[in-house]
Amino acid sequence: MLLRISVLFLLLGSCGALFGKRQKCEQITIPLCKGIGYNMTSFPNSYGHEKQEEAGLEVHQFYPLVEVGCFQHLKFFLCTMYTPICQENYDKPILPCMELCVEARSKCSPIMAKYGFRWPETLSCEALPKMSDQMSTGNICAAPPDTPKKQHKGHHHKNQNQNQNQNHNYSPDGPEVGISKIDNEVIAGPSECQCTCNQPFQFVASEKSKVGNVTNCAYSCHSPALAESHSLVSNWMAFWSITCCVLASFTFLTFLIETDRFQYPERPIFMLAFCQLMVAVGFMIRYFVGHEEIACDSMRIKGADDNSGSLCFVVFLLTYFFGMAASVWWVILSLTWVLSAASKWSPEAISSFSFHFHVVGWCLPAIQTVLVIVFNAIDGDPITGICYVGNTDLQFQRIFVLFPLLVYFIVGVLFLVIGFCNLWSIRNEVQKQHPSLESAHKITQLMSKIGIFSLLYTIPSLLIICVLFYEQNHRSLWEQSQLCSCSPKQTIGDSSLIISLIKTCCMCILGWTSGFWVCSTKTLSSWKNAICCLGSSRSLPKYQPADILYAKSDMSSSQFYNTSLRHNHLYGGIPDKL
């Protein structure tokens, strides 16, 4: 008897707790739903979301539709669906009225249909309470004051048939959510081929943004096929950019320490090293700042129609301008070798054109950069996060990247071959006339050095050009396979990752080649003297006068002048060749 009474009290207490439970209101934190006329909501919502973070991810997929402005109360309707109104004195969440849903559907469905989308099943209107039934059912609903209270029968019948067609294709696993996940079957019929923006791309409001021939479409911030490779890409970028920065800095500082040692035709190597140093800095900024901060605009990649942020522009300027400048200086280097070997120009004669070399070396890439900015061709890379040219637009890549690099490469290699052939003929001539002289050995050594340097530079440059040609041929096919229902599906995950890794490596490894040129015992001596002079430059003069003993009869002879020069003592840090 006592046990029965205890069970009875336990059941009564449980029922009381159940009926006395009220929903808990919480402040709205979803950015899209702030400042829309109410600020309190309750969870879980009708979609089963337990937290606002979950609901926010789904409702923000409709943001492009809100930006289009097809319906003035669309934001209110979406927010009341995903973050229903919560009132402390009302036990149920307040959903939007069916009339509001129908009005939103009637005004926004035509725009969605224009791009091959249907009104999503998750926003079905038939399950929502009607404004006219609030008094009879007691189910309160939300709607702006100007919402039509009656529907046209023909319009209602049309929407009902449309939803029945949607239910025919409805998956039992649950409705797909968001514009990017709506069933993309062409409304005109399955037999008609039509290209529309769908995953893995993002629908955007701007008609200037397009992927292939599909407008209002953009690449996602991150390539969805490489979700597990972001750390690999970042670590790969860090390794090559940091090592390139170190080696290019070493080369350029060596040139500054002993400028007179490096004359034309080899001096352009150090301009090339400086350019590669700046390219490496651009990659390092991307690595330390992050992918999203550099190349992304919310959930999508920055496109050509966007106003690129300051960091994105800085990364573009460092990687594109100085990358193209390095290619121009490569052509100038090959030209100076031709002038030296084929035309027998002296270093002084070549140096007289130094100003012209600098004008071409810096103005030509500057003109290219200005044209890129004028045509708004800067965009982000969804794989590496680098702001460059042609990451999402093949036409811009072809005009501003592939064509200039191909021209610079062909001209540079042509000059290089001409100079190399002339050096070879000079070497053979010297060997025939003076086989015992050391000059032939020095020419052979110089040819070997030039040959190794040329291979170290031309191979990465050729790889970049080949990769760009591959992208020109295959990226458009992949885009078409994702956008068009009648195209055979293609995967690009592994190949796009390999392409990005090759481009990053080749753009940075060019800085290694300049380090090869200065690797010698003379360079070590120059650094040793420079380091020693840093500590002694303030305390010791560069020259120390010597006591010269001479006879009066020697003052008028030429031997006196030569003898006095030999008794002057030069300290470290002053080059032997003045």
UniProtKB/Swiss-Prot annotation:
Subcellular location: Cell membrane
Keywords in alphabetical order: Cell membrane, Developmental protein, Disulfide bond, G-protein coupled receptor, Glycoprotein, Membrane, Neurogenesis, Receptor, Signal, Transducer, Transmembrane, Transmembrane helix, Wnt signaling pathway
UniProt tissue specificity: Expressed in two pairs of head neurons and throughout the pharynx.
Biased composition annotated in UniProt, kind: Basic residues: 150-159
Motif (Lys-Thr-X-X-X-Trp motif, mediates interaction with the PDZ domain of Dvl family members): 522-527
CC per GO annotation: plasma membrane
Composition-biased stretches (Low complexity): 160-169
Cross-referenced InterPro entries: Frizzled/SFRP, Frizzled/Smoothened_7TM, Frizzled_dom, Frizzled_dom_sf, GPCR_2-like_7TM
Phenotype on disruption: Displaced anterior nerve ring and neuronal cell migration defects including irregular localization of canal-associated neurons (CAN), hermaphrodite-specific neurons (HSN), anterior lateral microtubule neurons (ALM), and the right (but not the left) Q neuroblast (QR) and its descendants. Axon growth and guidance defects whereby some HSN, male CP neurons and CAN extend ectopic axons or branches, and furthermore some HSN irregularly route towards the ventral midline of the body.
Membrane-crossing segments per the record: 237-257, 269-289, 313-333, 355-375, 399-419, 450-470, 498-518
Leader sequence residues: 1-17
Chief location bin: membrane
FZ domain mapped to chain residues: 20-144
Family, per entry: Belongs to the G-protein coupled receptor Fz/Smo family.
Record remark on domains: Lys-Thr-X-X-X-Trp motif interacts with the PDZ domain of Dvl (Disheveled) family members and is involved in the activation of the Wnt/beta-catenin signaling pathway.
This protein's name: Frizzled-2
Organism whose genome encodes this protein: Caenorhabditis elegans
